[in-house]
């Protein structure tokens, strides 16, 4: 789209960009809102063959393929979509989501695969395709859980521990590979505390900003730190939360001009 086009909506900051796109690092003038930069913790997914997920859903998740069912079964069960394709149905969506999240949180399922359950439509969506933005958050299994990196500093010594737990593994985990539980573990000890979620999964989650929010309502996740909504240049701004937006925006642009390409 031409930067001279006088159109407002493509330039606006959309709510789905929270945590994924830096809200202050964008140029002024005609390109405002067109040129975007990732938040500092955002990753971009790579392709994971959907046939591997479909096989897992059938063999471990107990999903019924469309070719195996009758019309009556379709009407009375939860539909399963993978990358936009309707592949099967399931009669216990709560159990399917629970076992999927468990396997993903111990590394038996690639962390880049997302799950989102649309309750009104009774559809579970899975995405394995490339180009999706994902970001890390604390996941919450019970309201008593303390979501703080400082609290877990003595136990979790690496990003791998945070994502997959502290249980001793038989082999190094590949982020794009499916595993059987027996391939990786002999027993289940320390759980992971962080998982990556994409925009689709975020839409069906309730994410708390801080630990105190748990007292008001039930949440599914908690932010690691509010500053993670900013990108690299946004983190260079002094007292970013105390400045008006144009000052922060100018700071990002002028800081880029001041830094050599060799830095």
Q: Across the structure, where does each feature detected by a protein language model lie?
A:
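Conduit-forming functional cores of very large proteins
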Residues: 1-263
